[in-house]
Amino acid sequence: MNKKLLVQGFLGCWLTLMASLALAAAPDPQNGYLTDSTQRPPPGRSVLGIIAGGASGTYIRIASDMASVLDGPDLRIIAMVGQGSAQNINDLLYLKGVDMAIVQSDVLEYFKRHRSDQRLENKISYITKLYNEEFHLIATEKVGTLADLAGKKVNFDVRGSGTALTASLLFDTLKIAVEPTHFDQATAMQKLKGGEISALAYVAGKPTALFEKLAAADQLHFLSVQYTPDLMETYLPATLSAQDYPTLVPADQEIRTIAVGAVLAAYHWNVKSQRYRKVANFTNALFQHFNEFRQPARHPKWREVSLSAILPGWTRFPAAEDWLKNQPRQP
């Protein structure tokens, strides 16, 4: 009997202790902490995820601006670090919680050529074009023209990156067979200076920090990319000048190249679905508050955005199309 009472007493003490610990560990909403019941968004508040770029890149800063400006009682935006345009598309298609993605505009052409079974044009639409990024191709002094790179090592950046995607399309389109390498840009720059590779490709808005510290003593120069009819289907013409890179481009010259657009893409949901309505609400909020993104506190690339810009080969998200039709005067 005493043993039974002892066991009961022990169990009682143990349960009391566990209950006390649970209460002590439970978040107290009155002190500003969230309980399980309050962690969920309030009814009617849409939560959307945007997959962007690397932690130090422009894409994630653009996504963070959207999260800051549009956050409110009806909308919350989660900006997520991404791993390049190709992976961002895969995340948009298959990763739970990803409603939109910032990608390069040539990603559709890349998938058509290399993953034709995906038929992305039927699955992905664009809310708006954001801004242009320039294709930089820097080489050693031994390389005079783009054609001279045939058979030589050219760094395409890491696999799956936007640069790798654009470089692959460019050399394929121009029918110049090079030997791609896939080092990160910092490593590739050291190998370029050491003569281990002949050129380095990089897609980024000019001027980019990767080239700003180069000097004449490094014996490197930009290669010109001629804007051929085949490139016109996917890219825009662009130039690099002494104003962009004073140590690499003579004051009286310009280097011709191409530019690729950064795009805010969304899955092409059925217009009657709840997922479509969520993205449609975001689109309306983005467009209505667009002038706030052009303020000095936001990334300067916002001032290059035209909501009405058309992207060849892409289908505009229906809610964006409807908003533009009802707003004749567009920024």
Predicted features along the sequence, with ranges:
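Bilobed "Venus flytrap"/periplasmic-binding protein-like clamshell domains
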Residues: R45-L70, I77, E133-Q190, G194
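An extracytoplasmic/periplasmic, membrane-proximal ligand-sensing/linker region
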Residues: T187, K193-G194, A204-D218, F222, ...
